[in-house]
Swiss-Prot record:
Site (Cleavage): R352, G353
Additional facts recorded: Major glycoprotein, comprises over 80% of the envelope proteins present in virus particle. The extent of infection into host organism is determined by HA. Influenza viruses bud from the apical surface of polarized epithelial cells (e.g. bronchial epithelial cells) into lumen of lungs and are therefore usually pneumotropic. The reason is that HA is cleaved by tryptase clara which is restricted to lungs. However, HAs of H5 and H7 pantropic avian viruses subtypes can be cleaved by furin and subtilisin-type enzymes, allowing the virus to grow in other organs than lungs.
UniProt GO MF annotations: host cell surface receptor binding
Side of membrane Extracellular, spans: 1-543
Organism (species): Influenza B virus (strain B/Bonn/1943)
Compartment(s) where it occurs, according to its Swiss-Prot or TrEMBL record: Virion membrane; Host apical cell membrane
Lipid-acceptor residues (S-palmitoyl cysteine): C571, C574
UniProtKB keywords: Disulfide bond, Fusion of virus membrane with host endosomal membrane, Fusion of virus membrane with host membrane, Glycoprotein, Hemagglutinin, Host cell membrane, Host membrane, Host-virus interaction, Lipoprotein, Membrane, Palmitate, Transmembrane, Transmembrane helix, Viral attachment to host cell, Viral envelope protein, Viral penetration into host cytoplasm, Virion, Virus endocytosis by host, Virus entry into host cell
Short name of one Pfam family: Hemagglutinin
Record protein name field: Hemagglutinin
Modified how: Palmitoylated. In natural infection, inactive HA is matured into HA1 and HA2 outside the cell by one or more trypsin-like, arginine-specific endoprotease secreted by the bronchial epithelial cells. One identified protease that may be involved in this process is secreted in lungs by club cells.
InterPro entries: Capsid_hemagglutn, Hemagglutn_HA1_a/b_dom_sf, Hemagglutn_influenz_A/B, Hemagglutn_influenz_B
Function: Binds to sialic acid-containing receptors on the cell surface, bringing about the attachment of the virus particle to the cell. Plays a major role in the determination of host range restriction and virulence. Class I viral fusion protein. Responsible for penetration of the virus into the cell cytoplasm by mediating the fusion of the membrane of the endocytosed virus particle with the endosomal membrane. Low pH in endosomes induce an irreversible conformational change in HA2, releasing the fusion hydrophobic peptide. Several trimers are required to form a competent fusion pore.
Length: 575
């Protein structure tokens, strides 16, 4: 038997946090209240588009071509000639149908509006200095090169697109289809984008210009793609695109993409617009829908939110295409555990007693310390002292950082792998891109959520292990100078003020230094038996007599029960 009387101090281990618990999801325990969390998601707000940090970003194809659409630049409108800067990223800012301020074009008959987008997809773009075909002497000629007042040049004279030559035959006669080969004239490794087309008008104008008022046939072939056209005769109202003279005629414009060293062919009749200067393009530029102007810089360009600066690894909200150092879309907000399981003080006081409540309070939050720090606290006459254990805290931080980095690296790799596969597929099934992109996003989101659940499980278990290790170290340092009262707390045989606690945190504590006579120590006195005049023999006699009597009584009782059970003895009870 031991009697404990004390006026000593208590020292407890714990982890700091806010007083309010946080909830995280785990793989096997479901939702768990923890002492701290790291938010992993943010919900962005809409902003203007910007230049991507550290990356050449292209807005307009030709920034110095004023009052020109990107289609003007792509077709080589006389007043819209200029250099296209190199760029790793291009912003598709012309989302509505765009016209060209030149001769009226029948946009709906071809994919010509896609030409600027095609060019945006290249990092390096240049217009050839020489013509790919000698238009005057092409098959079916000789030709006179036509111009139009609807397409004024820099001196406001009649002009035409730099990428095409309007081949008006000198001999006004009908012509069977003829073929011209389009040679590859770009540098090795460049794709050649060759623009061509044809002109059609009323029967009267077709007869006057070409000597044939019948519909004409045209065919292009390059890179395994064949396209056929038949011209439409008449029925056009007088109009112009943006400026210049109104025209009753129309032009149909198309393009072919020629891979390195691969020629193309064009089969045509009257009204041909022969290829002239060609676009030579190389490298890849990522394209994203957006708007101009580009203001400032951003980590990420997002089709729905504009320019974003990454503050969290993941985001919730609208999913859309994004490029750059972007957060990854997830369905629901995610939190990473940054502490131990939360234990409410009131519950601990009821179930584990006063000292259990103290331990729970410490794990629930210490005032005056940064959230997430491991350390010690002492309670006594000096009040409350708190000291952080830097080594244990750093180990915990490293563990959480490792989980966070591993989580990020894992998902970035998955994103890159899935994106790469889907981008390749996208080239074959463009019409399914949005559905494929949604499927990709859902897949990645599910993987991220599972990874966070597993990480939370590991972090919570790891934090509990850190606290147990901290408790073992404290017990070893205190040695016989303290009594383990459970729940990470010890009652010391000496006072432990802030200096004492700092020594413990620094691992330089010496019990002898604080076990001075001036301190009130833990008084433990053995219980003693009072002497009432009885010696040891008398006590032993009393004990043996009582034991013998008890044994005899038990034997008699057992015998009576046995006899009654065999009907050898009857027992009657009378009142």
């Amino acid at each position: 038997l031991m009697v404990v009387t004390s006026n000593a101090d208590r020292i407890c281990t714990g982890i700091t946090s806010s007083n309010s618990p946080h909830v995280v999801k785990t793989a096997t325990q479901g939702e768990v209240n923890v002492t701290g969390v790291i938010p992993l998601t943010t919900t962005p707000t809409r902003s203007h588009f910007a230049n991507l940090k550290g990356t050449q970003t292209r807005g307009k194809l030709c920034p110095n071509c004023f009052n020109c659409t990107d289609l003007d630049v792509a077709l080589g409108r006389p007043k819209c000639m200029g250099n296209i800067p190199s760029a790793k990223v291009s912003v598709l800012h012309e989302v509505k149908p765009v016209t060209s301020g030149c001769f009226p074009i029948m946009h709906d008959r071809t994919k010509i509006r896609q030409l600027p987008n095609l060019l945006r997809g290249y990092e390096n773009i240049r217009l050839s200095t020489s013509n790919v075909i000698s238009a005057e002497t092409a098959p079916g000629g000789p030709y006179k090169i036509g111009t139009s007042g609807s397409c004024p040049n820099v001196t406001n004279g009649s002009g035409f697109f730099e990428t095409m030559a309007w081949a008006v035959p000198k001999n006004k006669t009908a012509m069977n289809p003829v073929t011209v080969e389009v040679p590859y004239i770009c540098a090795k490794g460049e794709d050649q984008i060759t623009v061509w087309g044809f002109h059609s008008d009323s029967e009267t104008q077709m007869g006057r210009l070409y000597g044939d008022s019948n519909p004409q046939k045209f065919t292009s072939y390059a890179n395994g793609v064949t396209t056929h056209y038949v011209s439409q005769i008449g029925g056009f109202p007088n109009q112009t695109e943006d400026e210049g003279l109104k025209q009753s005629g129309r032009i149909v414009v198309d393009y072919i993409v020629q891979k390195p060293e691969k020629p193309g062919t064009i089969v045509y009749q009257r009204g041909i617009l022969l290829p002239q200067k060609v676009w030579c393009a190389s490298g890849r530029s990522k394209v994203i829908k957006g708007s101009l102007p580009l203001i400032g810089e951003a980590d990420c360009l997002h089709e729905k939110y504009g320019g974003l600066n990454k503050s969290k690894p993941y985001y919730t909200g609208e999913h859309a295409k994004a490029i750059g150092n972007c957060p990854i879309w997830v369905k629901t907000p995610l939190k990473l555990a940054n502490g131990t399981k939360y234990r409410p003080p009131a519950k601990l006081l009821k179930e584990r007693g006063f000292f259990g409540a103290i331990a729970g309070f410490l794990e629930g939050g210490w005032e005056g310390m940064i959230d997430g720090w491991h350390g010690y606290t002492s309670h006594g006459a000096h009040g409350v002292a708190v000291a952080a254990d830097l080594k244990s805290t750093q180990e915990a931080i490293n563990k959480i950082t490792k989980n966070l980095n591993s989580l990020s690296e894992l998902e970035v790799k998955n994103l890159q792998r899935l994106s790469g596969e889907m981008d390749g597929l996208h080239n074959e099934i463009l019409e399914l891109d949005e559905k494929v992109d949604d499927l990709r996003a859902d897949t990645i989101s599910s993987q991220i959520e599972l990874a966070v659940l597993l990480s939370n499980e590991g972090i919570i278990n790891s934090e509990d292990e850190h606290l147990l290790a901290l408790e073992r170290k404290l017990k070893k340092m205190l040695g016989p100078s303290a009594v383990d009262i459970g729940n990470g707390c010890f009652e010391t045989k000496h006072k432990c003020n802030q200096t004492c606690l700092d020594r413990i945190a620094a691992r330089t504590f010496s019990a002898g230094e604080f076990s001075l006579p001036t301190f009130d120590s833990l008084n433990i006195t053995a219980a003693s038996l009072n002497d009432d005049g009885l010696d040891n023999h008398t006590i032993l006699l009393y004990y043996s007599t009582a034991a013998s009597s008890l044994a005899v009584t038990l034997m008699i009782a057992i015998f009576i029960v046995y006899m009654v059970s065999r009907d050898n003895v009857s027992c009657s009870i009378c009142l």
